[in-house]
From Swiss-Prot:
Reactions performed catalytically: a UDP-3-O-[(3R)-3-hydroxyacyl]-N-acetyl-alpha-D-glucosamine + H2O = a UDP-3-O-[(3R)-3-hydroxyacyl]-alpha-D-glucosamine + acetate
Record keyword Ligase present: no
Protein name in the entry: UDP-3-O-acyl-N-acetylglucosamine deacetylase
Residues annotated as binding Zn(2+): 79, 238, 242
Cofactors named for this entry: Zn(2+)
Task of the protein: Catalyzes the hydrolysis of UDP-3-O-myristoyl-N-acetylglucosamine to form UDP-3-O-myristoylglucosamine and acetate, the committed step in lipid A biosynthesis.
One Gene Ontology term of the molecular function aspect: UDP-3-O-acyl-N-acetylglucosamine deacetylase activity
GO BP terms: lipid A biosynthetic process
Organism: Photobacterium profundum (strain SS9)
């Protein structure tokens, strides 16, 4: 059977909080089968746990946050969640001594490195996949996102970014997901934003950790980062990275195809909630090794 995965060892790193601009320590711990993905704030007494859950997600102008019934939140979870999806990690405890996951370089690549450093351990329990059985679509004005049946995991994403520095032919990406494709083609894509928005947020004491070190920053005419883009389609690639993390808020890899136009965290989350609210739209699936879609056949141990 295809088995659940966790980490082999505890790993730790430090980074800067996007909101606070302060140092954040991040610790990833192995977890037993069927634990799921648990985010934990250790700066609170007692510590507060936030299980990955589509219904706990709150989208903000800056990031994705998980919020519990008491209104306590943990922010900026999206890129680490994408890395967990990319590596197929089912069970992990994620500890931070702050209200947010560190932003690192604005991509998922540092988290991939951290997970690979910990190593992957397989557990004696079947891995459960969420298989899409019928199309589900969410629309918001001209924006839309849908999940349809597909024997694998494919993402077909289009953005519409009218900017002189962004080529019109670099605004669509179709990806057949695998751990290898995520690590090689997706994980290094950074988040992006406009200088005017960052300056405004910082004037309001927000986004104090935002910088050229952890985002692609644009003005009305050009990309302001000295090194430019890591690859020509980095912006749409980051939107795909975000979607992979958003869909993994159900705690399971999805078997299906996501198609989207101008979608973001909020629409992605609405789509996942709509699927989970319709019991005829999905089923839980486990696989023997020879049955699994090739997408999910190999753990992601390729070095980034």
């Amino acid at each position: 059977m295809i088995r659940q995965r966790t980490l082999k060892s505890i790993v730790q790193t430090t980074g800067v909080g996007l909101h606070s601009g302060r140092k954040v320590t991040l610790i990833l711990r192995p977890a037993a089968a069927n634990t799921g993905v648990i985010y934990r704030r250790t700066d609170l007494n007692p510590p507060v746990d936030f299980p990955a859950d589509a219904n706990s997600v709150r989208d903000t102008m800056l990031c994705t946050a998980l919020v519990n019934e008491d209104g306590v939140r943990i922010s900026t979870v999206e890129h680490l969640n994408a890395a967990l999806a990319g590596m197929g990690i089912d069970n992990v405890i994620i500890e931070v001594d702050a209200p947010e996951i560190p932003i690192m370089d604005g991509s998922a690549s540092p988290f991939i490195y951290l997970l690979q450093s910990a190593g992957i351990d397989t557990l004696n329990a079947p891995k459960r996949f969420l298989r899409i059985k019928k199309p589900v679509r969410i629309e918001d004005g001209d924006k839309w996102a849908e999940l349809v049946p597909f024997n694998g995991f494919r993402l077909d994403f289009t953005i519409d970014f009218n900017h002189p520095a962004i080529d019109a032919d670099q605004q669509r990406l179709v990806l057949d997901f695998s751990s290898q494709s995520f690590i090689k083609d997706i994980s290094r894509a950074r988040t992006f934003g406009f200088m005017r928005d960052i300056e405004y947020l910082q004037s309001q004491n927000l986004a104090l950790g935002g910088s050229f070190d952890n985002a692609i920053v644009l003005d009305d005419y050009r990309i302001l980062n000295d090194d430019g883009l890591r690859f020509d389609n980095e912006l749409v690639t980051h939107k795909v990275l975000d979607a992979i993390g958003d869909l993994y808020m159900c705690g399971h890899n999805i078997i299906g195809e996501m198609r989207a136009y101008k979608s973001g965290h909020a629409l992605n989350n609405q789509l996942l909630r709509a699927v989970l609210a319709d019991q005829e739209a999905y089923e839980w699936a486990t696989f023997q090794a020879e049955e699994v879609p090739v997408t999910f056949a190999q753990p992601g141990m390729v070095l980034a």
